[in-house]
Amino acid sequence: MRERASAEEVKTRCEENGLEVPRDLLDADGGTMCASTLDLYIKYSKYSVLAFLMNTFPAVRDRMLADPRFAFKLMVETGADVVMNTATEIKQRGDVFWDEFEFFACDQIAAFAVNTAILTICSPAIVLGNTTRSMRKLGELSKNANGAAKVWYVARKYVGKLPANVFMLDPKLGMMAKLARGGATVIARGGQIFFVSTLCGTVGQATANSLMMLRRAAGRDKYSKGYAESIDVSVDPPVLDTGLLWGRFMMFSANIRQQLVVGGERAVEQFTAGMPSASGRRLANGATVALRVFNNLKGGSDFNDFVIGQAIAEASRRDGGHA
């Protein structure tokens, strides 16, 4: 089998399978694709859920094509989080669970989006073509820019060349170069995770508050009697502060934990590479389940501790201000 499929072959095979050639592939120089990647793209497109993910989220698609197990990892990561969060919320909220259901539902949706984004950010991706239009444009802008704009474009270009996680650093690099690029990778991924987590947390809390106000406007009979009597209409959960709380926690804790999980999976995959395919796949999948379930348990526990710590610190600041 040839290493790369020509642009004409890519177009023909996609049309034969009732698919459109990805827009960014058409924008790439030459429009060629690795033959194995093309086979995987066509295979995934036959499954409606995977086809939806690939067509809707190009970043997820590029990870799925780079790693045949990415979809499984995503399912375990998000599925385990949903199950454990639901169990925890039911236990903690108890009798008021249905009275606060809008907050639970919005938290779940926001958490799903954040978990998907974090795994995507820290996972390797394929580049469908050679040089995409956006990369060419970035190169042109960096050449013509001056001052702060020049620094910004150069920084963007540098970050774009960093690996998805520290375990993908070039082994040929010296120790100091590895430390520098490894540190830059952690910081860059942390910045991306902070932005996404803050956005999801803010939107999720704003949506929950809006649903809460609509529910209250419909009448207190929409709540249990005891809960209705305890409602303070003058107080709403903070929106931006909640988003920033998510962002601060995720950029450090979730960033490091996700990179460690990806590194663990990478080590297991390398270990199973020489094993029979069925046995190796079962071992790799088992390791993914164990690592990602533990990651969710650890993350949930750490987040609760973080929230409590932030609440105590805020109370101390208020007490100090009144002193």
Give the ranges of each region predicted by the language model.
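Glycine-rich, hydrophobic membrane-spanning regions of integral membrane proteins that mediate transport
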Residues: 1-323
